Structures are given as C-alpha cells and as structure tokens.
Amino acid sequence: MFSAAPAEADGPGVGAPYVVTLGDSAISGEAGRWAGNTNQSSSKTDALGSTAYYDNAANTAETISGCHRSKAAEAHIGNGVMSANLACSGARTYTQTPGSGDFKPGLDFYSDANGRKGQALALQEFAATHNVKAVTVLIGANNFGFADIVQTCITNFLLSPSWWPNYCNDDSNVQAYFTTAAVNTQTTNVKNALLNVRQAMLNAGYADSSYKIIVQTYSSPIPNSSGFRYSQSGYTRQNTGGCGFWNADANWANSTAVVKINQAVTNGAAQTGLTNIRYLYATNALNGRRLCENTVGLLEEKGVATWQSTGAADKTEWVSQVRTLTTVFGPYQIQESLHPNYWGQKALRNCLRMAYNNGNPITGTCTRGTGLNAYGEPNMSFA
C-alpha cells in the first residue's frame, strides 16, 4: 500500500512567492484612501472608504492602530505574487513605545509581553512559513523628523507675511536634522536596519542568494517654486491647495531635505556590503502630479466630477493635502498629510512590480507616464 509523501509546508523556497514591505508611512499606504484632492465633498475622492486602513483578516480593524496599511499600498503587486505589508506609518529605524499614542514598530527585533514586535522580528516569523522572494524597504524620513519639519514649514508660512517671510529651512530645529553628524547618524541607522532585515531572513532559513532586498528612495511631494499653481502671497497656497510652503522652503525641500534623506538611505544600503540589494529610485516618480503642481489641480479646478471620472489620474494630484488642526474635518486625518495618495501608491505599486521583475529583482529609476494600465494603475516606466 502506497501513501503520498506529506506535503511540504510553505517556507524558504517552498510555496507561492511573496513580496514583503517594511518601513514607514511612505510605503505602508498612508493617505491611500484618497484619490486626488478636493475642497468639496470628500466623497468625490474617497476611493477606499472608511475601511481603507483595516488590515486584519476580518477587515474590521487595523492590526496595529495608526499604521495605516492601506489596500492601495504598493506591496500588493498581484500577478501571481502574494504580499505582506508589515510597514507602519510613523515608523523610524528603531521601535518607539510611547506612553500614550500608538506603538510604532521599527526595523528591529523588539518584543514585549503584549505581543508587540519590531518589523524585523515580524518579518522573521512571517518568512519562516512563507516563500519570501523580495523584501522592499523604505525607511529613514521619520528619523529626520519629517512630520516636525512639515509642521514647522506650514506654521511659518501661515504666521508670517509674504513681505517678511519666516522660512523653516533656516530654523535651528530643522537645520539640526541635516548637519553632517546628524546625516551620518541616520545613515548608520539605515545600514543597521537593513542588516536587521538580512538577519531576520537568515534566522528564518534564507541564504542571501535566495531573495533580494529592494531599497526604495522617497518621492518628492511638492514642486520647486516655479512649479506651484498658487502664489506664495496671500493664503491660497495653504487655504485652497493645502501646500503652505514658502518658495524658498519648497526649493530647499527638494534640493536639500529630500536629497539628504535619500542619500542616507542609499549610502546606508551601500555600507551594509550586502550583495542582494537592489534599488528602486523613486525620487522623481510623482513629478508632474505633485501637491499644488501647475500641471494638475483639485478635482473642481480641472472639471473632474469624481476620482472615477475618465482621465482623473492625469488631471489631479497624487499627493495628499496638508491638513492642520484647524482644517482637518470629517473623514480626513492629519497624519495623511503630504503622502502619496491612492494614485501615488498605485503608481509606486506599478514601479515595484517592474522592479520585482518576475522574481529576479532589478535596480532602476521609476518615471511617470500617462494613462492607466490594465490594473487601473498609472502607467510608469522603470529603467
């Protein structure tokens, strides 16, 4: 009498292939609920509805409050590839356990009696029972105080007149994040986070040659000064557009802040010495569709009825408006401010699918196209 050999359990090299994403809000899916921006009814841009960030099995809640792992997140490339989004909005390279507020798992092996785990430990446990072919990482911006910087810039814009602007780029608390010593510290933090990813995979039974780490860079969210469709004089830049940055601060954001954060990411990756790293360069991926850019507009400015209208993705913004305590209302949340929205995330998902390259990940730069592909994502190129 013959019996079939027992089926091998899924794990390293066995079972359906998986892509796992680790990092912060820029990859977890923050703002993924919204497709474009409007100052009219929020229903016009509400692509995913009130359950947008629910990621538990029953679709009834978040597994970790505030992580905002949206259903539009780039992890979910499909095409026969399974996905797990372990990233968390607000995450730094290291785990944060505030006395009040939400738990923020970093790219470490944190574990506590409440069952809370760092993202590296979560990856290790997941990878042991799933066939992970690529781990995509986007981390570092919160180490540089991203949210604090944005708040400082917007506050300075709103509280100073155009004839005597108070810039954020020369504020001591902002400059402190970008000193040579500070950048070197964050570069080391990124390096160690990526080495934790490698250690997690090693602990789960993976040789370096059996998977790739795809290191992603941050996308510029706003244009340079010449690309804004609202003047910096008056208040329309913030009150209408939700992009209250002085021209000089917008230029600094692109020439200095985004550059130095991304240098910490790529230099940190290089310093690991790992040979299984690939790069997804996304710095300019949203160009032409950024917040308040003069090539796009609010839905009502472009005559677009809803996010589902033909051509909406080419006419409206791929980055969410900055909302403040006085302008946040209804279903919007302050933490969604200045993140790639539904369209931005779908565009980056397209990029990640191309970087994944059918299981043989490659390095490349992602560039925006026009129109939508068969998955309903903005067309992008990767080379």
PLM segments and residue spans:
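Secretory targeting and sorting signals
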Residues: 1-9
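Short, solvent-exposed loop/turn and secondary-structure capping segments
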Residues: 12-13, 29-35, 95-99, 146-151, ...
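Catalytic nucleophile-elbow at a beta strand-turn-alpha helix junction centered on a G-D-S/GDSL motif
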Residues: 17-34, 45, 144, 342
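Conserved SGNH/GDSL esterase-like catalytic core that processes O-acyl groups on lipids
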Residues: 42-181
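A structural motif corresponding to the C-terminal end of an alpha-helix
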Residues: 74-83, 186-213, 249-281
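Mobile gating loops/cap/lid regions near enzyme active sites that modulate substrate access
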Residues: 220-339
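C-terminal accessory extensions appended to soluble enzyme cores
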Residues: 356-383
